[in-house]
């Protein structure tokens, strides 16, 4: 009897223990650009899939690559690499190949973006286009009554300690444009010679007296404008959106030299333990209604043109969706930089210069 009682007691304990444990909802971990996990559109996915979204934000492509290669790749399920590092991440085995049959909205995405080779390696597709846009010149409309027509205004003697630049390689590209290194081939911005890089370095060191602070996050630049510490900077449409919502007098323009820009993809890391859930998240994020919601928050152009049907005419015009092809000619989309280490070396020398 004691033996039977003991077994029954153990079984009862097991039943009680099992019944007393509530299964925790899965957490999908993101490493993405700012604005890509806003509650306004992420919350609906959490509710419908009974999961949690946890997001960490990156300030540059180099930060993303460093984290993936530094042993923390297993901490993340979904990443949003830009067009300068997407191919490298896929080729390095840091992202998982996608089964496109799981993405009903994939064929709705811009054919131009889908057909780019950025995330295609050995016949596999490793990411879905998500958003795209420029790195525009942002300016205080009280200081500049008319939109500045050239990046060279940042070097103006009247702007000492009144501008900000992005702590990222895009600042090198911008200086290279001023020096004419984008002609005749804009792609040359991403493969400059040593001599050209040294000339870029000199040009950027000349800019340093005007730099109040280099920004690394969108929130940081937003604060610099709101605190009236700067009146001009290279920025993101997201920052323009944030400042306009705060009623700050901000303007945004692409100068006559044009500008660089990016195509961001969503990828699933090869180390993810939630690949099925991550795939469902990617599908949700490229659906037309979600793409419209992302544009509301970020001011970025949607990869899914069908998002336009949910927008007002003013929003479509502000995103240049009425003339996308012409708008894209003003943007030199980031490409892989073969000598990225050399570019970073030059940029670090600029930052260290007195």
Regions found by a protein language model. Name each.
Residues 324-354:
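Conserved C-terminal helix/tail region of periplasmic/extracytoplasmic solute-binding proteins
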Residues 80-86, 90-226:
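Extracytoplasmic ligand-binding site segments that recognize negatively charged/polar headgroups
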Residues 260, 269-331:
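Mature extracytoplasmic/periplasmic domains
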Residues 21-89, 222:
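Early extracytoplasmic/lumenal segment of secretory-pathway proteins
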Residues 136-143, 178, 263-274, 293:
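A bilobed periplasmic-binding-protein/Venus flytrap-type ligand-binding module shared by bacterial periplasmic
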Residues 198, 203-207, 244-270:
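Periplasmic-binding protein-like
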Residues 1-28, 354:
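Short, low-complexity disordered leader/linker segments with a strong preference
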Residues 86-88, 234-249:
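A ligand-binding cleft/hinge motif common to bilobed small-molecule-binding domains
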């Amino acid at each position: 009897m004691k033996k039977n009682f003991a077994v029954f007691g153990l079984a009862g304990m097991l039943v009680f223990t099992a019944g007393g444990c509530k299964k925790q909802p899965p957490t999908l971990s993101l490493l993405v650009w700012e604005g890509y996990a806003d509650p306004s559109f992420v919350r609906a996915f959490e509710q419908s899939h009974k999961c949690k979204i946890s997001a960490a934000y990156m300030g540059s492509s180099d930060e993303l690559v460093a984290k993936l290669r530094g042993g923390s790749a297993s901490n993340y399920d979904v990443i949003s690499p830009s067009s300068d590092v997407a191919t490298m991440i896929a080729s390095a085995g840091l992202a998982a190949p996608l089964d496109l049959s799981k993405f009903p909205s994939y064929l709705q995405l811009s054919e131009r973006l889908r057909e780019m080779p950025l995330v295609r390696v050995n016949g596999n597709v490793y990411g879905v286009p998500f958003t795209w846009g420029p790195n525009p010149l942002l300016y205080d409309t009280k200081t500049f009554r008319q939109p500045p027509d050239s990046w060279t205004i940042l070097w103006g003697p009247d702007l000492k300690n009144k501008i900000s630049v992005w702590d990222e390689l895009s600042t090198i590209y911008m200086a290279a444009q001023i020096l004419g290194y984008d002609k005749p081939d804009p792609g040359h911005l991403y493969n400059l010679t040593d001599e050209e890089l040294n000339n870029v370095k000199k040009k950027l060191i000349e800019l340093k007296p005007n730099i109040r602070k280099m920004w690394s996050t969108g929130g940081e630049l937003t604060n610099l404008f709101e605190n009236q510490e700067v009146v001009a900077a290279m920025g993101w449409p997201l920052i323009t959106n944030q400042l306009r919502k705060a009623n700050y007098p901000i303007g945004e323009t692409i100068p006559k030299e044009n500008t660089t820009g990016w195509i961001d993809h969503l990828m699933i890391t090869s180390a993810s333990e939630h690949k099925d859930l991550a795939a469902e998240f990617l599908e949700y994020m490229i659906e037309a209604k979600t793409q419209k919601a992302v544009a509301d928050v970020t001011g970025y152009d949607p990869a899914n043109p069908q998002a336009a049907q949910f927008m007002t005419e003013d929003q479509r015009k502000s995103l240049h969706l009425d003339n996308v092809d012409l708008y894209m000619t003003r943007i030199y989309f980031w490409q892989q930089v073969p000598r990225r280490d050399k570019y970073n070396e030059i940029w670090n020398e600029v930052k260290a210069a007195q």
